[in-house]
Amino acid sequence: MSNEMKLYTVLSYCLIPIALFFAFLDIIILATSLSNPSALIMVFIVACLVIYTFTSFKFLKTGVEREQIQTKKTKDWIKVNAYVSLFLCSLFFINSISILISTNEVLSGFINEFLEQQAGFPAEITSKMILSILRGVSVFLLVTGIIGIVHIRTTLRLVKRYDYLFE
């Protein structure tokens, strides 16, 4: 097994718990979007990441490793969801970088402005707490974005390389 395939396999296994986490979030977003239909676009985008993760994992296990014939439908599912997931992972990456390179003063200003607009916000939640949560979430999304972008790039290359498996 080449180094590229070893990395791809590791990234695939890393994406599975991330996809399960996002599937759980997607169910919550779906429940809240029933009262706000414009949020359904976010449900669709997050669902694409989950679908991409599991269809690409199926392609890895049955197509690449066992060289079993795959349907054209599987190829279409991988490619369509890969492009939407690439968009989402790029957003994760760009937003995380912008938050992580911002100074604490700038972010604290935005957080304080946000807290002033929230009328019944609990006093126990301070701007420092929100800042640390924001930075932690940004690191998680940065890692997710990098893993996703590298994985999607490799998947699209493998789909092209193993094109003969799709009938």
Question: What positions do the PLM features span?
Answer:
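Membrane-helix interface motif
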Residues: 23-31, 60, 97-112
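Transmembrane alpha-helical insertion/packing segments
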Residues: 1-58
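Membrane-interfacial helical/loop segments at transmembrane boundaries in membrane proteins
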Residues: 104-126
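Juxtamembrane loop-transmembrane helix junctions in multi-pass integral membrane proteins
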Residues: 3-6, 32-36, 66-79, 122-132
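Hydrophobic alpha-helical transmembrane segments
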Residues: 119-148
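Physicochemical signature of membrane-embedded alpha-helices that form the seven-helix bundle of GPCRs
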Residues: 8-14, 21, 40-47, 77-87, ...
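Hydrophobic alpha-helical membrane-insertion segments
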Residues: 80-104
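Cytosolic juxtamembrane helix at the C-terminal end of the final transmembrane segment
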Residues: 2-5, 56-74, 99-107, 142-167
